[in-house]
Amino acid sequence: MDNRGHFSSNGNFPPQGYHRREQSQEGMRIGNHHGPFSSGNMRSIGGSAQNQQQRHWTNMLNGSNNVENSWVCFSGNTSLADDPNVLSNFSALAQQRVNHFDTIVQERDNRNASFLNGSAVGNNLNTSFSVFGNLRGGDQDHRVLSDHTGIYTGLGSTGQNAVGTGIRLAADVANGNFLEQRAPTAMGHNQSYSALNQSLAPTLLDQYNQALLDQYNQSSQMAQGRGYPAPNIAYGLQNAGFPAPQIAHRPNTQNADPQAMNMNNRLRDHTFQMPHTNAQVPMSSLPGLFNLSMNHGSGNQQFQMNQSSSGPAPQLPNLSESFQMAQGSSQVTMSSRPAHSNTSMNHSSRNQYNHVDQRPSRPAPHLPTLTKEEEAFLETPDFEQFGRQLYNYLLPGILPNGAADTFSDAPKHQLLKLAKTLKPMLYDYWRKTMQMQNRGANINIIQWIIDFNAKFAALNSSVAKASNSSDVLNQTLPTAAEVSDVAREDASTSQPSKSRSMYIRPAASLDNTLETLDENLDSSQSHAGPVPAASTKPKTPSFEKMIRYSGIKKRSTMDMDNFVRMLDEKINFSPEPSTSSDIASSVKGYMSQSFLHQQDDEAPDCTKNVHSESDLKQAEPQESDKQSDKELPSNE
C-alpha cells in the first residue's frame, strides 16, 4: 500500500503533530548536552512514557553511540492475509499508525499474522512487533504482550521522528537497568489502546545495533558505502526524505513494504538531510528564501545564496575588471565606485571564496519643493542674474556646472548656465535665509529678488553717471523700471518677453573679485558731475555690499560651510569639453558681475543718460541702512 499520504491534503504542510514532534526533537538535543530534558510534546504510542524515553535517549547520547548521526528504523514483514479489507503488505492498524505517528513500525496480531514459516501463534492479546522481520539467526520476534514496552518516537539525526523500541531483555533485568515503572500501551488488533505495565530498557538500542549488525552484515556494509553511520542499519525513514539502501535478503520480501524498503521515497517531503560526512542541502519550503550549501570534491567549495523575493532587483555596475590567478584562497571584491574597482578570481584547487561588496554611488541631490510660479521664476533672467551673484558670493572663484551656450544673435558671447539642480538649491537657500533673517516671516522672495536686481542695476548706473563713463561694465544697463517689468512678465508667463529678449553677457573687461569690489557708496553717489582726473575711478558696487544694504548680515543667518559642503558633494562641477580656454578666461570674475541686457538691435544709446533722478534717489541707501552698515564689522 502506498503510504505517501502522510501530509495534509494540500501537499504543502504537515499536520500539527508533525510540528510538535519537531519541536520536541530540538528540546531533546538540548537535553543531550545538559542532562535529561522533558517535553510534553513527545509522544510514544501510549503517550505515557515521555519522560522515561527522553532520559533513555539522553543517556545514550552521552555514551559512545552517537544517535544524532544514526538511523535506527523498524519495519515489519507480516500481513493480515485473511483480511479482505487490507492489502497483502500492511495491516490497517499499521497503516493508521504510519500516517499518525510518522513511524514505519508494523504491529501484528498473532492471531491473523503469517510469519516466515507460514504459521501463526498467539491469541487476541498476543500483540508483538517485528524489527526487520526477525532477530538473530532468522528467529521471529514471538514474545508476547507482557514482554513488550512501547515504541517511542524521537531520534535526532533525521530531522523528523524515528522510532525506538522497548523489548524487555533478560540481561537488562539481571543488571537492574530498568528505569522507573511506567504504563506504556501498544495497539492490539481492533483495539484503540491496551495497557502494558512494563519498564524501559535504557541499553536496548545498543543491543539491537549489535544484533542487527551481526545478522545483516551485508546491509551494514551497504550503509557504510553510502556514508551512513556503521553501527546502525542504513534504513531510511519514510518521513525523513532521504534515500535508504535496499534490504531484501533476510526479511520476508514477499510481504515487506516495497515503498519503505527500496530507494523510492516520498515525493512530497519538505526536508532532505544527510550525515555530516556528506553534502548537506537544507532547503526551505518558503517560496522566497533558500539557503544552499554544497560539498563538491576534495577541496571544500561552498556557495551560499540568500534570496529574498521582496527585495529590489540588483543594480549591476558597469566596471572594468582585473583578474588575478593565484594558488590557495583568494577573494573577489566588487564595488560600484568606478575609481575603486578590483576583482580577483582564483582558479586553483584550493578553497575559493567570493565576496561582493557593493556601495551605492553618490545620492541624487535633494531638491526643495517649489511652486509652479517659483519654478517658472527660476528660468527667468532675473533669477539667473541673482543666482550667479549669490553663487559667487558663496563660492568665489568656482564656476557653476553647465554647458557652454552660444546665442544665435550674439555668437561671440558664450556663458555657462546654472545647472537645473543648482537653481532650486540656491533659491531655497536664499528663501530660508530671508525667513531666518525676518524670524520666519513669509516673504515674497520672487519680488524681493526682482527689486534687488533693479536696485543693483540703478546703483551701477549711478556710478557710471558719476564717472561720466558708460564703460564701467563695458555695457549699458536698462533702467530699473525696465528690469522689473520684464522680470515680472517673464515670471508670470514663464517665457521670455518677445519685445525684450534678455540674456546675460559676461563682463569680459572686468577682472575684479569680490574682495576688490567694495566701495564707499556715499562718496560715489555724491558726485553729480564728471570725476576729476586726479581722483580714482570709482568701482562697481559689490554684490556683498548690496546684500548688506538689503538688511542681510553676512554669514550670520545660515551655516555657510554646510551649504558649501552640500554643493561640493551633490553638484558635479565639470563643464563641457567644448568650452574653450578663451571662454574660461573671459569668465574670470564673471560670477560677481552678470547683468541683464537687451539685444543688440534694441540696445539704447550708450551716450545717453537713461536713468532719471527718481531712479537715482530710489537707489540711494536710506539712513537706517547706512547706520546699520557702519555697525557691521567689515570682513573685507
UniProtKB/Swiss-Prot annotation:
Keyword Phosphoprotein: yes
Tissues expressed in: Not expressed in the adult germline or in any somatic tissues.
Segments of skewed composition (Polar residues): 1-13, 38-54, 292-355
Compartments where found: Cytoplasmic granule
Phosphoserine, modified sites: S574
Modification after translation (UniProt): Phosphorylated by mbk-2, which promotes the disassembly of zygotic P granules in the anterior cytoplasm of pre-gastrulation embryos. Dephosphorylated by a phosphatase complex containing the PP2A regulatory subunit pptr-1, which promotes the assembly and accumulation of zygotic P granules in the posterior cytoplasm of pre-gastrulation embryos.
Biased amino acid composition, Basic and acidic residues: 608-636
Region (Disordered): 1-54, 289-367, 484-504, 521-542, 591-636
GO cellular component, one term: P granule
Result for mutant: S574A: Reduces phosphorylation
Null mutant phenotype: RNAi-mediated knockdown results in sterility, and in P granule segregation defects. Simultaneous RNAi-mediated knockdown of meg-1 and meg-2 results in defects in P granule disassembly in the anterior cytoplasm of the P1 blastomere causing some P granules to be mis-segregated to somatic blastomeres.
GO BP annotation list: germ cell proliferation; multicellular organismal reproductive process; P granule disassembly; reproductive process
Keyword Phosphoprotein: yes
Annotated keywords: Developmental protein, Phosphoprotein
Subunit structure: Interacts with pptr-1, pptr-2 and pgl-1.
Function: P granule component, which acts redundantly with P granule component meg-2 to promote P granule segregation during embryogenesis, and germ cell proliferation and differentiation in larval stages. In its phosphorylated form, and together with meg-2, promotes the disassembly of zygotic P granules in the anterior cytoplasm of pre-gastrulation embryos. In its dephosphorylated form, and together with meg-2, promotes the assembly and accumulation of zygotic P granules in the posterior cytoplasm of pre-gastrulation embryos.
Protein name (database record): Protein meg-1
Source organism (scientific name): Caenorhabditis elegans
Lineage of producing organism: Eukaryota, Metazoa, Ecdysozoa, Nematoda, Chromadorea
